[in-house]
Amino acid sequence: MPKMKTHRGAAKRFKKTGTGKIKRSKAYTSHILTKKSPKRKRKLRKAGIVFKGDQRRIAQLLPY
């Protein structure tokens, strides 16, 4: 059986942590930033964790 392919779009957006969780970046950070408060923009810089329900689906896209 041939090797499974990694979904390249998912590989650019998600990273696996050491404990097996999946990290993601937050949305709403690229433009229209003037109306967003500094506190909100600061919170958007921090990485988020993928929810349990979505984690299995994303893990299938990232086999390695």
Swiss-Prot record:
Gene Ontology cellular component annotations, sorted alphabetically: cytosolic large ribosomal subunit
Pfam families: Ribosomal_L35p
GO molecular function, one term: structural constituent of ribosome
InterPro entries with a match to the protein in the record: Ribosomal_bL35, Ribosomal_bL35-like, Ribosomal_bL35_CS, Ribosomal_bL35_sf
Biological process annotations from GO: translation
Region (Disordered): 1-44
PROSITE patterns membership: RIBOSOMAL_L35
Signal peptide positions (record): none
SUPFAM superfamilies in alphabetical order: L35p-like
UniProt keyword list: Ribonucleoprotein, Ribosomal protein
PANTHER family per record: 54S RIBOSOMAL PROTEIN BL35M, LARGE RIBOSOMAL SUBUNIT PROTEIN BL35M
HAMAP family membership: Ribosomal_bL35
Stated family: Belongs to the bacterial ribosomal protein bL35 family.
Protein name per its UniProtKB record: Large ribosomal subunit protein bL35
Gene: rpmI
